[in-house]
Amino acid sequence: MSIPKALSPGECAFALHCQAEGLSPEREVVFAPPRKWRFDFYFPDRKLAVEIEGGTGMYGRHQRPMGFERDAEKYNTAAIMGITVLRFTTRMVMRGDAISEVLEALK
């Protein structure tokens, strides 16, 4: 899996963890057309999406009321479609929690 230059620090670390484990998730996968929602990482054969949430230590887009509502709509739609979404903060990725949980989910 190549690592695009526009990744956040958490996404970059998660991509490297995936490489180390021999995993090749798809990146920036659009789902639920005509919506333009994207998953940061997606394992299509397992219907498993991974989202690395940025801006959790500040009042970022995902924590503002409209951003939170849009995220809820996105994740609810994914659930209705049978897609499991695992969400992680950058700190969780750096500690190794994210890759551990993804490996467990892929068993």
Label every PLM stretch briefly:
Residues 1-107:
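Nucleic-acid endo/exonuclease domains
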